[in-house]
Structures are given as C-alpha cells and as structure tokens.
Amino acid sequence: MIDKKNITIGIVAGEVSGDILGAGLIRALKIQYPQARFIGIAGKNMLAEGCKTLVDMEEIAVMGLVEVIKYLPRLLKIRRLVIDTMLAEKPDIFIGIDAPDFNLDIELKLKKQGIKTLHYVSPSVWAWRQKRIVKIAQATNLVLAFLPFEKAFYDRFNVPCRFVGHTMADIIDLQPDRQDACFQLNLEPKHRYVAILVGSREAEVQFLTPPFLQTAQLIKQRFPDVQFLVPLVNEKRRKQFEQIKAQIAPHLEVVFLDGQARQAMIVAEASLLASGTASLECMLCKSPMVVGYKMKPFTYFLAKRLVKTKYISLPNLLADDMLVPEMIQEDCTAEKLAEKLSVYLEQTESGIKNRQHLIQQFTQLHQLIRCNADKQAAQAVIDLLNDEV
C-alpha cells in the first residue's frame, strides 16, 4: 500500500463538467488519502476541495476544430507548463479528466517518464477519430468510462477500461423533487417554466443564444403563461448573454439564475439546451428536452465528415434511439426549435401521455448509469496506485 501521507496527485479538468467530476473524485480519494496533495488545472468545484490550479480552467475550455487553432499558442504554452510542473512534482499518478485533445499528450509524455496515468471520461472514440484508440492505449494505464457501451468498445481493442457510471446519476434522485427545486429558486410551483441553457463555453453562448431567444419569443406567443429560466455558469457568460439579448429580444422577460441549472431543469416543464453533458443532466432531472447545436460552418463541415454516430446527445446515445429531438446547424432555427418544444408544452391527453412515457424512459437510463461513480472512480485510482489494475 502506497504511503498515505505523502501522496501527490496531478489532475487536470478542461471545462465545467470535468470540474464537477474532479471534485467528486477528490472527495472520494481523500477518504483513503486524507493528506493527499492535488495539483493541476481546476475549476471552482475542485478548488473548493483543495486542488491547486496552475491557470484559470477557462483558458483551456475552447470548443470546435477551428476555434482551437485561434488559441493554439496559448494552449500549447499551458500544456507545456503542466508537463514541466508534473515532471518536477513527480506525482504518484496523473488524472486527465475529459479534454482529450489537451490531456492525452500530457498523459503520453508523463507515462513515458514512468508516471502512472489515468484518463477519466472516455474520449468519444466510438463516435469519431477512432484511430485515437492507439494513442489512448499508449498514453494511459487505465480509462474510466461513464457509459456502458464505451467499455465494450475498449474491450474490443484490449485497452484497460472500467465502467464507473456517472456521478450526476448518483447525486440526482430518481424522482427529483420539483417543490424543493422551486423553493431553492424562490419560484412559484404553480407556474409553468421552460429552461434555456446555452452552454458553458464562449462560442456556445455566441452561436446558440440568438436562435434560443428567438425560440423563446415564439413559445411566449403560443403559451403566454410560460416563464423562462436562464441559468448561466458565471458572470462572463451572463454579460455575454445579456449583450446578445439586448439586440435579439430586449423585451423578453427571463429569470436569470446564478448556475443552478439542475434546479431549473427539475422545475422546467421542458428544456432547450446545447448538446453535451447538459443533455445527460437534463435526462436525469426528468425534463423533456430539445437539443440544439450550432458552430462555425467550416467546423461543422469537418465534424459532419468525422462523426460516426447516429446521434449527438447523450440520452439518444445511451438509448440508441431518438428519444429527444436534435436540431443541428441549419435545423437549429427558432421555428424548428419552437415546433419541437411545443410538443412538450401542449396540455392535451396525448401530449401528457407522451411526456410521461419519455420520463419513464429517462428513469430507466438513469438506473443504468447509477453506480456510485465517485467511489468506483476513486477505487480505480487506488487500484492503479497499488498496481492492482
């Protein structure tokens, strides 16, 4: 058993969802290693658990193939800083959380220097750029996956992988308490709400806010009693959203929330959101949703030719079925989004029945990935530290 007092763990998260996963993992590891040091790149959740960060996490949270090129010099400089720091610190293990294009190169270099490496959250190799499996095998001692079909993919290539479930599936109740969520947000439970979630990245807010606000205007015309909840991850994203709103929909009333996306989804009769981890969270909150996504045309041109899956949203990928509408690029228009969203808001008998059936399907998927992920992930780290993988 490794010395519990002097353990150092390198850990890098690249965006908000990874920061949440990292915080849960750190909490679980501190049960076994209460004196452990954590150093790397952290967001507010990991910082709250005592992780030291080398740079602001948002500096590496860029999206899209084209957008990365713009920030490449800075990204490379930060990556070099992480590698140099880790080689100097010589952590007992390095954990890269998601952000594969950033983390895998770090893991590869550290593993070559004899540092154990673990990648938490499988890159979407099953969806696109499948040849990355070779690099993943070279860069990591172990991959942790939160989707069952991901482990099956790794098993085909004999790459060590554990399915650990997803921490959000553990945290969120199978039957979320809407009354309590309304209380937390100081909202009237008898009112009708739609949640609008434009994403956590600058580019997502830029591309999705206009069509999402225009959708809200159309929904308001058709359902005047509906109120809109807009959770934003930080002050930067709120200012960005407000600037766009002033041009697109200055008179549309919305309730701004400081984070609190989960409570908003639980309260909402339906949600309009970006693809990504938010779609999984929305499913776990049992909120019927429409997924919209837009990016720069050239980024989309490249992505369309690289992606190998039928779906982009996690509920649909988990179910291997089109449970929720996906409106991508040219389909991500106010008219089309409003049409799909309206289905969930109709108070007809068939509408209510369809909604109940969807929530039942969401619950089944919730149970599938509810595995006490923090504990499972921490145990995987401990096993790797003790050469039991």
UniProtKB/Swiss-Prot annotation:
Q: Which GO BP terms, alphabetically? A: lipid A biosynthetic process
The record's section on InterPro entries has:
Glyco_trans_19 (IPR003835)
Q: What does this protein do?
A: Condensation of UDP-2,3-diacylglucosamine and 2,3-diacylglucosamine-1-phosphate to form lipid A disaccharide, a precursor of lipid A, a phosphorylated glycolipid that anchors the lipopolysaccharide to the outer membrane of the cell.
Its lineage opens with: Bacteria, Pseudomonadati, Pseudomonadota, Gammaproteobacteria, Pasteurellales
Q: Per its record, how is this protein called by name?
A: Lipid-A-disaccharide synthase
Q: Which gene encodes it?
A: lpxB
Top-level taxon of the source organism: Bacteria
**What GO terms fall under cellular component here?**
membrane
- What EC identifiers does the entry list? 2.4.1.182
